[in-house]
Amino acid sequence: MATPHINAEMGDFADVVLMPGDPLRAKYIAETFLENVRQVNDVRGMLGFTGTYKGRPISVMGHGMGIPSCSIYAKELITDFGAKVLIRVGSCGSVRHDVKLRDVVIGMGACTDSKVNRIRFKDHDFAAIADFDLVRNAVDAAKAKNINVRVGNIFSVELFYTPDPQLFDIMEKYGILGVEMEAAGFYGVAAEYGAKALTICTVSDHIRTHEKLTAEERQTTFNEMIEIALESVLLGDK
């Protein structure tokens, strides 16, 4: 049954959903990588699609920016539309000199300055982590394509324009691979409702050096990340 945010029915979404933040990215993924595509959501312009990749049903759905928006769509996909596996595919910024532009980062764990997981976990710390099998399959898929990936902790910030740049020094000290805005809450939702989740990001900006990918570089690296995500799903079916 449709929700206030998704005008679809049970069965419209596959059990595996790739989730970029930008709904136009969802459209691009569906049109570029999937076959037999049909649109299954357009509420508030948050586009969702279902198709097949090498014969395997897969859906793609935007989630917007930040933990609150991402959490709404992730929760409803799980509880109202039967999603079992959610893979966030997005971009992140680097705070480390050894994590470069175009690197692909797999978020094994996600730190955050958000309180959402403390709210759901009775004010205790919750270790927001990805599903191990999804991490392993993504690493194996990247190796098969000779794409180097970095695996470790990322950081989900509440504020894109942070008033405390010293936080980046602490992130670097603790080995944070990338900074984004969703993964910690995304993992919390998956844990609460019994689904598996993974975040894969490409480094599009370097917070220290102020380097940024060109539009062409961003697209090429984005495609590599999507290929890793899709191939990892096939590995998970074996």
From Swiss-Prot:
Any Gene Ontology biological process: purine nucleoside catabolic process
Protein name (database record): Purine nucleoside phosphorylase DeoD-type
Residues binding phosphate: 21, 25, 44, 88-91
Gene3D superfamilies for this protein: Nucleoside phosphorylase domain
Active-site residues from the entry: 205 (proton donor)
Keyword Transferase on entry: yes
Matches recorded under Pfam families: PNP_UDP_1 (PF01048)
Record keywords: Glycosyltransferase, Transferase
Enzyme Commission code(s) on record: 2.4.2.1
GO cellular component: cytosol
Catalysed reaction equations from the record: a purine D-ribonucleoside + phosphate = a purine nucleobase + alpha-D-ribose 1-phosphate; a purine 2'-deoxy-D-ribonucleoside + phosphate = a purine nucleobase + 2-deoxy-alpha-D-ribose 1-phosphate
Enzyme class: transferase
Subunit structure: Homohexamer; trimer of homodimers.
CDD domains: PNP_EcPNPI-like
Family statement: Belongs to the PNP/UDP phosphorylase family.
Binding, a purine D-ribonucleoside: 5, 180-182, 204-205
Molecular function in Gene Ontology: purine-nucleoside phosphorylase activity
Function: Catalyzes the reversible phosphorolytic breakdown of the N-glycosidic bond in the beta-(deoxy)ribonucleoside molecules, with the formation of the corresponding free purine bases and pentose-1-phosphate.
Site-annotated residues for Important for catalytic activity: 218
